[in-house]
Every structure is written in C-alpha cells, then in structure tokens.
A protein has these predicted regions:
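Short S/T/G/P-enriched beta-strand
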Residues: 20-52, 105-116
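A short beta-strand micro-motif common to beta-rich folds, especially ectodomain repeats
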Residues: 91-101
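N-terminal capping segments
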Residues: 114-230
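...with weaker cross-activation on analogous glycine-rich loops/strands in unrelated enzymes
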Residues: 192-298
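A short beta-turn/strand-edge loop motif at beta-sheet boundaries
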Residues: 52-59
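Low-complexity "stalk/linker" and mucin-like segments enriched in Ser/Thr/Pro/Ala/Gly
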Residues: 64-80
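Low-complexity, Gly/Ser/Thr/Pro-rich intrinsically disordered linker/tail segments
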Residues: 286-341
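Extracellular/luminal low-complexity segments enriched in Ser/Thr/Pro
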Residues: 79-92
Length: 341
C-alpha cells in the first residue's frame, strides 16, 4: 500500500511539474488572401494552428480588436479553431491580437474596403441599413421608447427638442447609440428598460459620422460623404422625403417607429410628422402616437401622446390620418429599415 501511495504521489507531482514547465507556443494564423468589404455583414475566417502542428483549443484563446470603434468584431470559434472577423462599416486597416495562457500573443492585420452601394437608389447607403430582423427590432424599440419617454420629461426635456423635426432627429440619433449606464445618465433616460442595441454599428461610428440625415435628393455616391449631402440637422420635410419611404395612406399599416406625415396648407409651418409608437413602454394600449406640436407665438409647444383611435376622430378633420383628408400624406418608414435582399 505504501508503494502504491508513493507511485500516485509521483504521478501527481509529475503532472504538476509538467504544467509548470509548459512553455507558450507560437500561433500560426493563415494570411488573409482577400480584402473584406466594410458593409457590416461580411465575414472572414482564418484557420489557426500552433507552430508545432497541434490544433489550439478555441476555449483557451482570446482575441482583441486593436482598431477603433466601427471596425467590426472578432472571435475565436470552432474545432479546429478559427479566427472569425465580422466586418464593421468603417473601412480601413483592422488589427486583431490573439493571446492565451499557453500561446504567445500574435497579431494579424487585414484591409477593409468601403461599401458605397445603395440597393434601393433612395440615397441611403447600404452600410447604414439595418439588415437583420433583430437590428430593425432594436431600432424600432429604442426610437419609440425614447420618443415616448420625452412626452413625460417635463422640465427635463432636452432643449434641442423644440418642434416635431427635433423630436425625430433626437430619437433617431439616440436610438443608434450604445445604451449603457453612462448613456442613460447623460440622457436622463435611466427609466427605460434594458434591451438589445443595434449590433451592426453604433452612432457616431460610421462613415457619415454624426451627420445622419440626407439633405439632398439623389442616389448615394461616394462624394456624398464629403460634399454636404449628409448633415446633423434636417427639417421635417427633408427628414421624411429624403430619409424615409412612402408606405401607405392606410394608417393601420404603420409599424412601431413609422412616421405619420401631414402637409397643413393653411399653416405657416406646413409639414408635420408624428411617430407611431404602437404598444407603450409606460402603460397599457397598443396604438399610441407621439408628436411635438411645435411653437405657436410665444408658446414653445409641447410633446403630446395620444392614441391613434382618438387621432382618427380628431375634432379638427385636418389632423385625421384618413385617406379622405388631403392634408394627410401617409405613413412613411425610415430608409435604414428597408430590407436588403
């Protein structure tokens, strides 16, 4: 029995010493033989092997993207292990570093090329379009939740929200941000429940930077990025006609985040838009609409929250979103929500 215990102890000791003596191995990363399009969709897989020919364990490896925001995401996956790079929307040089407990840190650099395509010819570059169902759902959730929240903001309403266009711009921009604790504190939006963010990109890390809105007509071309075609400010007419698509004059076809658009011929500020929220983030009901009245003389205006059923029977027929009202131009949907096939 003593011999048995001694042998067992030697085995444990040998295993322990072997672990301590294990030296980091050099990792071989297959060189990329192609450029990647910075379209927010493309994927590149690079097989990984240890220099001694062994296959590394993906669970023992970590990868870090050394490039700035907007350049994509990287992970180590599979068996045999591969470095998987998922393109962002910012073109340029992307460097990734792989390391592990028993692997010497290694880096690989790839080049990503710009994506200037515009699948619909509507002026929105494809790199801004939200290709996945989950991203479109995330945008709709945040856009409507933020707009609806501001209806309850009172004195905490951001100063920039002073008319219907400003409410659209603010809610659109904030919906595309990363929604962490720092954002919630800075925007006074801590009451909103946690939800998934848009994954393809986050504002302002895209080729248009903070200039989200198209202010000139036409299909997208590369020079639009530098010639003033995109801007941070756009009035409501430009927001809707140059950044959204017509859906229907049947308001019941509106989805959460769609715009209800009017032209009031009798008013000085002729164009007006409302946001169809649908189901509320703050209470019962599934047909809520939020809008800013705009200023009237010395009155700064206010954000109102009404149900679509009430709007359809509005005392003033000019505000009823029904086909028989010539002032109602229809339901519009943001171009970034158009589905690229």
């Amino acid at each position: 029995m003593r011999t048995s215990h001694l042998a067992a102890g030697m085995v444990v000791l040998c295993i322990s010493m072997a672990c301590r003596d294990r030296r980091p191995t050099v990792l071989d990363i297959a060189s990329p033989d192609t450029q990647v399009i910075a379209d927010g969709r493309s994927t590149l897989r690079l097989p990984l092997r240890n220099a001694n020919g062994d296959e590394p364990d993906a669970r023992e490896l970590t990868v870090k993207l050394l490039s700035e925001n907007g350049h994509g995401k990287a992970s180590v996956e599979g068996s045999p292990a591969s470095l998987v790079y998922r393109a962002g929307v910012m073109p340029g040089t992307v460097t990734m570093q792989i390391s592990g407990k028993y692997v010497s840190p290694a880096t690989v650099t790839i080049a990503t090329t710009p994506d200037y395509s515009d699948s619909f010819g509507d002026g929105a570059p494809d790199f801004l379009r939200l290709d996945s169902v989950t991203d479109r759902q995330a945008f709709r959730h945040w856009f409507t939740a933020i707009a609806e929240h501001e209806a309850f903001a009172g004195s905490k309403l951001p100063a920039e929200i002073n008319d219907c266009a400003a409410l659209l711009r603010y809610s659109y921009r904030e919906a595309l941000r990363r929604h962490d604790a720092a954002w919630a504190k800075a925007a006074n939006l801590g009451e909103l429940r946690a939800a998934a963010d848009v994954a393809k990109y986050q504002y302002p890390y895209t080729p248009v930077g903070p200039r989200l809105f198209r202010v000139q007509e036409g299909s997208f071309v590369a020079r639009d990025l530098t010639d003033g075609t995109f801007a941070e400010f756009a009035d409501v007419k430009t927001l809707v006609l140059s950044n959204a698509q017509f859906i229907s004059r049947d308001v019941h076809r509106a989805l959460p985040g769609d715009l209800i658009f009017y032209r009031q011929f009798e008013q000085q500020s002729r164009f007006h838009s409302m946001i169809f929220v649908g189901s509320s983030s703050f209470g019962p009901g599934d047909d809520w609409v939020v809008y800013h009245t705009g200023p009237d003389g010395s009155w700064p205006g206010e954000i109102r929250r009404v149900q679509l059923s009430a709007l359809i029977t509005h005392p003033d027929p000019r505000w009823r979103p029904v086909p028989g009202n010539r002032n109602f131009l229809g339901v519009y949907r943001w171009n970034i929500l158009r589905e690229v096939q």
